[in-house]
């Protein structure tokens, strides 16, 4: 059998009144971000309710998951159907709401990953994503999974390490060489 990529259905994810939560305390976010050595912070309730619900529905309904990753999760990218008016609105609002962080950097890529809950089982072949580094001037990650689906209530689902990848490492090293990363 030959794998063929065919977008069978792309859900609706149109622009909303305000994609990024209007109640966010921008000053506090800036303070936390710029007080960290590497420019790092986290924000709860990042998206507004309407944007969050629309994005969840879009990702659940759309057949845009064309890349099967090692570890048993699926990937979707802008060029393969992830692009939508809402995704582009979020990118635009990030630039206008956080100009001191985003600066003049352009959006280069957006991706989404869909995980299998079996990844939390230590004896499962489904492991999810390994420790890695993302290559970006500014990297923004957000999780849109419903809280009740989180299998570890003490965690938000993502671990961010307080370490910068060495400048002499290649993309392959900081994404695939687990023994050197650890």
Question: Locations of the language-model features?
Answer:
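Fe(II)/2-oxoglutarate oxygenase catalytic core
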Residues: 1-182
């Amino acid at each position: 059998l030959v794998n063929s990529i065919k977008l069978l259905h792309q859900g609706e994810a149109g622009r909303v009144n305000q994609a990024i939560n209007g109640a966010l305390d921008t000053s506090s976010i800036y303070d936390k971000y710029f007080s960290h050595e590497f420019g790092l912070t986290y924000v709860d309730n990042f998206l507004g309710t309407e944007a969050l619900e629309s994005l969840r529905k879009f990702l659940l309904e759309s057949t845009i998951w064309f890349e099967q990753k090692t570890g048993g999760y699926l990937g979707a990218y802008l060029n393969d159907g992830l692009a939508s008016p809402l995704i582009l609105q979020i990118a635009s609002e990030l630039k206008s709401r956080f100009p001191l962080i985003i600066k003049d950097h352009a959006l280069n890529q957006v991706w989404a990953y869909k995980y299998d809950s079996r990844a939390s089982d230590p004896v499962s072949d489904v492991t999810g994503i390994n420790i890695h580094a993302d290559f970006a001037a500014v990297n923004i990650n957000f999780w849109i999974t419903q809280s009740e689906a989180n299998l570890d209530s003490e965690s938000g689902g993502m671990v961010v390490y307080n370490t910068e990848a060495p400048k002499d490492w290649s993309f392959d090293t900081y994404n695939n060489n687990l023994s050197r990363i650890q």
